[in-house]
Regions:
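Extracytoplasmic/periplasmic terminal helices and flexible tails
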Residues: 1-74, 78-218
Length: 218
């Protein structure tokens, strides 16, 4: 088993991973369409399209972290699109060039994600705590809500950036503060090992923004 063989196998594995990521993106879009047909009254995921992208730069040790992915305007990527993996939310596209995009990481003080408890659908806001790339926080969560260590946190239906029920993490620690809980979340995704991601495009986000703007103007 020579050095040349090792290099050849490594390159083959990279190409295989890229192919699998692209195929998974296609399957996600197809599956969401099928799920919507079957569970139309409960599932809005048909409103999203998925594109695969590779992370080519990433930071985790700053107060405000960003990552770069290898898809841009020529691939249909736009500002405001969500970025996820099969282990959770990664961030939101901030800007794009022809072939690349900068993503505001979940590990960034500017990022807030609408979440809910999977077991009872109670809503909250998730933000990074600024210290550990494996953890995030939910603050000012009502203390009368049933929540326990190990409970799963997923995305809520309030955002049109991410599909509902994308996994995020589990409850690691619960602290009480004047009638509220401050909750520490262990993230499923390891941001130090990001490779392939999925860009999430909402087909109805413009319509939603226009409708909600008309209400705010009243």
């Amino acid at each position: 088993y020579s050095y040349a063989d090792a290099i050849t196998n490594y390159l083959h594995l990279k190409e295989k991973n890229k192919f699998l990521s692209e195929e998974n993106a296609k399957l996600l879009s197809l599956t969401q369409r099928q799920d919507h047909t079957k569970f139309e009254s409960k599932n809005i995921s048909n409103d999203f399209i998925y594109k695969s992208a590779k992370v080519i730069n990433n930071s985790i040790n700053k107060r405000n972290n960003y990552l770069t992915i290898n898809k841009g305007i020529s691939h249909g990527v736009k500002e405001g699109m969500g970025v996820i993996t099969n282990k959770g939310v990664i961030g939101i596209v901030q800007s794009s060039s022809k072939n690349y995009s900068i993503v505001i990481s979940l590990l960034n003080n500017k990022t807030s994600i609408g979440i809910k408890l999977k077991k009872n659908n109670h809503f909250g806001i998730l933000k990074w705590n600024g210290y550990n790339y494996k953890e995030a926080s939910i603050n000012n969560f009502p203390s009368h809500i049933d929540i326990s260590l190990g409970d799963t946190i997923v995305t809520s239906s309030y955002s049109m950036i991410f599909p509902e029920n994308v996994i995020i993490g589990t409850v690691k620690e619960i602290n009480t503060d004047e009638g509220y809980y401050n909750i520490l979340i262990h993230l499923f995704e390891d941001f130090n090992q990001l490779n392939y991601t999925y860009i999430v495009e909402s087909k109805n986000i413009i319509e939603k923004k226009i409708l909600e703007k008309s209400i705010r103007n009243e």
